[in-house]
Amino acid sequence: MKKLKINYLFIGILALLLAVALWPSIPWFGKADNRIAAIQARGELRVSTIHTPLTYNEINGKPFGLDYELAKQFADYLGVKLKVTVRQNISQLFDDLDNGNADLLAAGLVYNSERVKNYQPGPTYYSVSQQLVYKVGQYRPRTLGNLTAEQLTVAPGHVVVNDLQTLKETKFPELSWKVDDKKGSAELMEDVIEGKLDYTIADSVAISLFQRVHPELAVALDITDEQPVTWFRPLDGDNTLSAALLDFFNEMNEDGTLARIEEKYLGHGDDFDYVDTRTFLRAVDTVLPQLKPLFEKYAEEIDWRLLAAIAYQESHWDAQATSPTGVRGMMMLTKNTAQSLGITDRTDAEQSIRGGVRYLQDMMSKVPESVPENERIWFALAAYNMGYAHMLDARALTAKTKGNPDSWADVKQRLPLLSQKPYYSKLTYGYARGHEAYAYVENIRKYQISLVGYLQEKEKQATEATMQLAQDYPAVSPTELGKEKFPFLSFLSQSSSNYLTHSPSLLFSRKGSEEKQN
């Protein structure tokens, strides 16, 4: 995966061509009869997307996601509200453009020659490859040549259909597949791990995120090379919306916003460790329930799930953990640090968590105010691991090497240099295991992503089970209850033991469409 890197050569050429073609209408906000004017008159930017961990998601009713955040900032740039419509699959997205129900599609869509025949692309902002996936333990195909429609299913509107057709015509004449008109790629990947489907195809970023929650999903082979991802708008003679998008993305690049968004959503790395992820998720089921109340109790300024991820990275949630260097306990505190925090027993889980939070808060308070709010925690965690003085050195080294010392993306690239003599010999505080601090923060981010996604999945399953129970045992009137034998006691037994003990706070509906006003 190539991360959020805007293709500025492409933008520059396109901007020049647009400037020549549109010079009578520039500035784009100066005309009354154009798409931008219509959007501003309406007071809202209508964006259609799909529900994925990367593009658009919700936690506790609050929307987030790479495409959502970019779309929200673009709406702010235009001075209008953002209206998001969530569709079930890609075909429905393009229907919105065809029917005039959307101004833009922001859903991690791949640029290809077929799509640009009918729709206008925007700037490309990262790239993906299309990959065939299967379930660990099942047969792994090494080629597409013998796959049949009974084995391979893809989502409607998926860009890979064009690639499959080309491969069938040129290389694999026996290749066949089917399209499921009712399911998106995420749902098809779920079918694969549940054993309902042998294979499906999804993009490399979606697969990487899915594996954080479902490590049993594996990549069999690449179907395509890297393909650029972009937004799409209607193809017509009015290019004012394209001009506005170019202005917007250029401004985002110049002020560093794009780099921060890259780090936020794609900066956790794309390497996947099956064994480590599976071990972590087992611990979520078996160990976390006993510790969750403590994490929730002491997580004040950070999400309790992030605190849990920190503790897992430190000790794998083992209150008795001890390292050769003398650090001990759930949060692996040194003896001196524990004493300074008033901790009398480092192996007591509650004391250790309380002390770890206080120490992390101390690191957070030292991070300069010039660091963006949503990146301060990563600076603090690196300082938690290697000491704040070495974090100062890392920032100084970043500035000396023409990076931004307030950007975590820039600083983390320099952390490994703190253990290399040509660099640490010239720094104030000398040698540090910067490579370990780098890995420390990256691992915590991966555990946090897995934990959030896994808990969401569990709550979704509980919700679906409750809904199924309601369908199996519909409400009946007292009169009907007297007339017919009804398994009421069975209903109470199942409800109290399984379903009513779960009170889901995160609901993820994938039926039809949903509209959100922001």
Swiss-Prot record:
Keywords: Cell outer membrane, Cell wall biogenesis/degradation, Lyase, Membrane, Signal. It comes from the Bacteria. Its EC number is 4.2.2.n1. It is a peripheral membrane protein. Pfam families: SBP_bac_3, SLT. GO terms for cellular component: cell outer membrane. InterPro entries: Lysozyme-like_dom_sf (IPR023346), MltF (IPR023703), Solute-binding_3/MltF_N (IPR001638), Transglyc_AS (IPR000189), Transglycosylase_SLT_dom_1 (IPR008258). SUPFAM superfamilies: Lysozyme-like, Periplasmic binding protein-like II. It catalyses: Exolytic cleavage of the (1->4)-beta-glycosidic linkage between N-acetylmuramic acid (MurNAc) and N-acetylglucosamine (GlcNAc) residues in peptidoglycan, from either the reducing or the non-reducing ends of the peptidoglycan chains, with concomitant formation of a 1,6-anhydrobond in the MurNAc residue. In the N-terminal section; belongs to the bacterial solute-binding protein 3 family. In the C-terminal section; belongs to the transglycosylase Slt family. GO terms for molecular function: peptidoglycan lytic transglycosylase activity. This is Membrane-bound lytic murein transglycosylase F. Residues 22-269 are annotated as: Non-LT domain. Residues 270-518 are annotated as: LT domain. One of its GO terms (biological process) is cell wall organization. It is found in: Cell outer membrane. Its main location: membrane. It comes from Shigella dysenteriae serotype 1 (strain Sd197). The N-terminal domain does not have lytic activity and probably modulates enzymatic activity. The C-terminal domain is the catalytic active domain. The keyword Transmembrane does not apply. The active site is at residue 314. Residues 1-21 form the signal peptide. NCBIfam families: PRK10859.1 (NF008112).
